């Protein structure tokens, strides 16, 4: 069993989508189920409706899964496991106040040392714990031996005992901390491999420590993906528009192209343009670079254009707001100068929009409009053009410039003859 575990606290980040895609691919390769675990334990940060938005995006990208679960539904199991750790003396109640702990952190900061909890409550006698009426958290005891992770991407990572203190696993309100809930849920779901971002590397030894303390012996494999950098070489954040999957979709990037690009970067694929289903045949975690991947919007545009080219005319037509294959053919022509469905929509919209004719050509344009409205049907552009020239007496730029604007909505663009054969049935709507 593999899992994708997003939090419903904001728009889906491309890094999270990349994690979801990789989990999906590997689950198919291993013939194992994929579970979606909505990590909703941080009630203050949860945003209503974001869980549905996450699932809608996964469905849009063709990422199927066996079940959706909510971490908050497992609170009773988290509390039971915490009680077991307390009974086994693998955890202890901590009565240290927030003010006291903040003071200790400040002291560590001033002395330029890493803060580690000093185990002040680790050895309290049972009678003191029972009689104490102050609020408490639950901490798991720090490790005595090194914790070693064999990562599919990063190789061996070793954490010494001093790297991890006795950290909190249950809050004062009896809700689990992230690492505890995550470790317990991975046990409950029988997870075999965890694929996630490298920002979770420091969480992994803590989760291993929790499972070992609970007597869970199954080895869970790990693969931590390098972060994605922006143009400035910094980690992509919410300030970067392109970090939001929602933004990319609204800008007209196809799900298939976004997936293609996220698999492509920092990887060694056998070809540049492919689908997720094709990637299942050759994808390997071991081929993912250990170094951060840089996000290149121009490369994404290139990949997106190639995926748009693959679409048949009817399907492309739907992406630009029509249902006629002929409009899809026009969109294909405009792919010479456009890379997204948003750009294509704008190009097609100009054809059907009210035309903005320069003053010097308005009179000529009016003449052409009247002729077109009464003209017979012409299969070929040359016949259409010659008829208007003959009827209007116009020539040169006084003919071609207003005609182009009337038919295309712009003074520049593809060859009129190429476009005409696909819009000839719409002339009455185009030239109003």
Swiss-Prot record:
Annotated motif 'KMSKS' region, positions: 235-239
Chemical reaction(s) catalysed: tRNA(Glu) + L-glutamate + ATP = L-glutamyl-tRNA(Glu) + AMP + diphosphate
Major localization class: cytoplasm
Cross-referenced Gene3D superfamilies: 1.10.10.350, HUPs
The EC number(s) this enzyme carries: 6.1.1.17
Catalytic EC class: ligase
UniProt-recorded name of the protein: Glutamate--tRNA ligase 2
């Amino acid at each position: 069993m593999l899992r994708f575990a997003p939090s419903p606290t904001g728009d889906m980040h491309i890094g999270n989508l990349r994690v979801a895609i990789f989990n999906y691919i590997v689950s198919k390769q291993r013939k194992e189920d994929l579970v979606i675990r909505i990590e909703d334990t941080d009630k203050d940060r949860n945003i209503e409706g974001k869980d549905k938005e996450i699932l809608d995006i996964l469905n849009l990208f063709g990422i199927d899964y066996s079940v959706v679960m909510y971490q908050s539904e497992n609170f009773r199991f988290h509390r039971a496991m915490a009680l077991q750790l307390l009974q086994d003396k693998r955890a202890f109640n901590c009565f240290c106040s927030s003010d006291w702990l903040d003071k200790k952190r400040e002291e560590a900061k001033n002395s330029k040392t890493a803060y580690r909890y000093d185990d002040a409550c680790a050895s309290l006698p049972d009678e003191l714990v029972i009689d104490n009426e102050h609020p408490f958290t639950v901490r798991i005891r720090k490790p005595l031996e090194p914790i070693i992770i064999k990562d599919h991407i990063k190789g061996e990572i070793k954490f010494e005992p001093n790297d991890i203190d006795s950290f909190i696993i249950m809050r004062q309100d009896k809700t689990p901390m992230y690492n505890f809930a995550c470790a317990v849920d991975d046990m409950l779901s029988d997870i075999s491999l965890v694929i996630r971002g490298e920002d979770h590397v420091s969480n992994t030894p803590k989760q291993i420590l929790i499972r070992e303390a609970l007597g869970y012996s199954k080895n869970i494999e790990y693969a931590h993906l390098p972060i994605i950098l922006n143009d400035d070489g910094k980690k992509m954040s919410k300030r970067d528009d392109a970090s939001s999957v929602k933004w990319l979709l609204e800008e007209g990037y196809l799900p298939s192209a976004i997936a293609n690009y996220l698999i492509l970067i920092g990887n060694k694929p056998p070809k540049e343009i492919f689908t997720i289903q094709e990637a299942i045949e050759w994808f390997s975690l071991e081929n993912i670079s250990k170094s951060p991947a840089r996000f290149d919007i121009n490369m994404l545009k290139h990949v997106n254009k190639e995926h748009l080219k693959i679409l048949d005319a009817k399907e492309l037509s739907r992406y630009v707001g029509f249902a006629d294959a002929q409009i899809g053919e026009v969109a294909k022509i405009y792919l010479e100068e456009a890379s997204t469905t948003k750009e294509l929509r704008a190009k097609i919209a100009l054809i059907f929009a009210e035309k903005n004719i320069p003053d010097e050509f308005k009179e000529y344009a009016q003449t052409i409009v009247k002729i077109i409205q009464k003209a017979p049907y012409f299969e070929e552009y040359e016949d259409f053009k010659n008829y208007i020239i003959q009827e209007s007496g116009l020539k040169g730029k006084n003919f071609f410039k207003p005609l182009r604007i009337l038919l295309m909505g712009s003074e520049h663009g593809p060859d009129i003859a190429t476009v005409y054969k696909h819009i000839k049935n719409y002339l009455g709507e185009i030239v109003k």
